[in-house]
Regions:
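Structured, contiguous alpha/beta core segments that scaffold functional sites
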Residues: 1-262, 266-268, 272-275, 279, ...
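Active-site-proximal structural scaffolding
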Residues: 106, 203, 221-224, 266, ...
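Short acidic alpha-helical/loop segments enriched in Asp/Glu that coordinate divalent cations
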Residues: 241, 281-292, 318-331
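A short alpha-helix capping/helix-coil boundary motif
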Residues: 247-251, 331-334, 343-346
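Hydrophobic alpha-helix feature that most strongly marks membrane-spanning transmembrane helices
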Residues: 278, 313-317, 321-329, 359, ...
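Small/polar glycine-rich anion-binding or flexible loop at a beta-alpha turn
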Residues: 291, 333-341, 371-375
Length: 407
């Protein structure tokens, strides 16, 4: 290679990901270009994605084998179990893999992983960036996936070779991108943040005005400015009193209606973004308004699990069964997340309900144990008599008139 070849060799000034973001970025009414990277710079969006993907990544996930109609147990020894619970691929832990896949699912509406097979067994799951995958449905209704490699070549994979997590979809083929649907909200949040930064950079926030009854010479005005800056400027001097001399008066400048509206817009954007992701506002630091999910943090947390996380959990469980388990095992093996850890804060209310259900014969002990993912015990299929009918079960109804009371 000649010495001058370094000058002739083209150099990449931007990365491929940056070019992809530029092409995919959407112009908004606010003027902001919303891309995956710019969306993650919005604090509310970052927190929502982090909360949901973090929950999916940390919740216990296991394969459960159905022993019989009642008994369930971990599918110990099943090859896929190690992939899901120990090591999905050579460089990721299970929580890292699920967290990344869920983040892609939230932003792009789809998450993909290539299955590495040895015989009939999945031995690794290789995550694929959604922007490199084109999902198509054939005339036979089977899916196929065209994946663009880092060298620019495209490889086509059959449905049986890909794990596909699909968000809410209108065509049943690909999930809808949250990033595309909330680009106006994200654009407004980005522009509001930028406007605030420029406001502080240009120093347009005035604390007040000092009025002098006379006329100050340029030198006197300069000395007054320097004196005020030395004594009152900076965070360490915040709150210090100003000593007005020679008849001077201090008039504070109140927050203008425009500034107040700017602050209100920032608050509104947090609620709007939280609504897109289904995250309770208090979980992203927006506590100014109440919620209809309950008056307490505990009730709001349960609502988050019930109305948001359960949707994604079901997507994971059913996609694992469809794409990773052989059809011959569909009746015997299930993928299950354990959300009990997120609901432990309501243990008092949950067990109080169980006690009432047991007392009134609604549940048997084994049915309660099943709700808690516990195996049945001997003698646990008994239904207890309600308290006010104890000893009456099995007796013929009496024809005697009911007793009456007299005043």
């Amino acid at each position: 290679m000649g010495i001058f070849s370094r000058f002739r060799r083209p150099r990449a000034l931007v990365s491929e990901d940056q070019i992809r973001d530029f092409i995919r970025g959407s112009n908004t009414t606010s003027g902001a270009i919303v891309t995956e990277s710019s969306a993650m710079r919005v604090a509310a969006a970052w927190r929502c994605i982090n909360i949901i993907s973090g929950a999916i990544g940390t919740l216990p996930l296991d394969l459960i084998r159905r022993v019989d109609e009642k008994v369930r147990e971990p599918a110990v020894g099943y090859p896929l179990r190690r992939i899901l619970t120990v090591k999905p691929n050579p460089w990721q832990t299970p929580s890292e893999f699920r967290r990344m896949m869920q983040a892609n699912l939230l932003l792009r509406g789809n998450a993909y992983a290539r299955k590495v097979m040895v015989g009939r067994n999945v031995v690794a799951l290789i995550p694929l960036h959604p922007d490199r995958v084109q999902a198509e449905q054939l005339d036979s209704f089977a899916m196929q996936y065209k994946v663009r490699g880092s060298n620019g070549t495209t490889t086509t994979f059959a449905q049986k070779e890909i794990l596909h997590l699909r968000g809410m979809s209108l065509d049943g083929v690909t999930g809808m991108s949250v990033l595309s649907n909330m680009r106006e909200s994200l654009g407004l949040a980005l522009q509001t943040e930028k406007a605030g930064a420029r406001l502080f950079k240009n120093g347009m926030l005035t604390g007040g005005v000092i009025e002098h009854p006379g006329k100050l010479s340029p030198e006197a005005a300069k000395n007054l400015h320097e004196s005020l800056d030395a004594r009152n400027a900076g965070a360490d001097n915040a709150g210090k009193w100003i000593l007005a001399e020679e008849g001077m008066t201090f008039r504070p400048v109140a927050l203008s209606a425009e500034d107040a509206q700017w602050l209100g817009t920032r608050d509104y954007q947090r609620y709007d973004i939280a609504m897109f992701f289904g995250v309770p506002p208090h979980m992203i630091g927006a506590t100014e308004k109440t919620t209809s999910w309950g008056s307490g943090i505990e009730a709001q947390g349960i609502g988050f699990v019930t109305y948001t996380l359960n949707d994604w959990i079901k997507t994971w469980e059913e996609s694992i069964k469809r794409d990773l388990l052989p059809e011959s095992d569909w009746e015997a093996i299930d993928a299950r997340f354990n959300v009990n850890g997120l609901l432990r804060g309501d243990v008092k209310g949950r067990w109080g309900g169980y006690v009432q259900a047991l007392q009134w014969g609604v549940y048997s002990p084994n049915e309660v144990r099943a709700l808690e993912d516990q195996n049945p015990r001997d003698g646990g299929d008994v239904y207890y008599d309600p308290p006010n009918t104890a000893g009456q079960i099995g007796k013929e109804p009496s024809n005697e008139p009911a007793p009456t009371t007299t005043n």
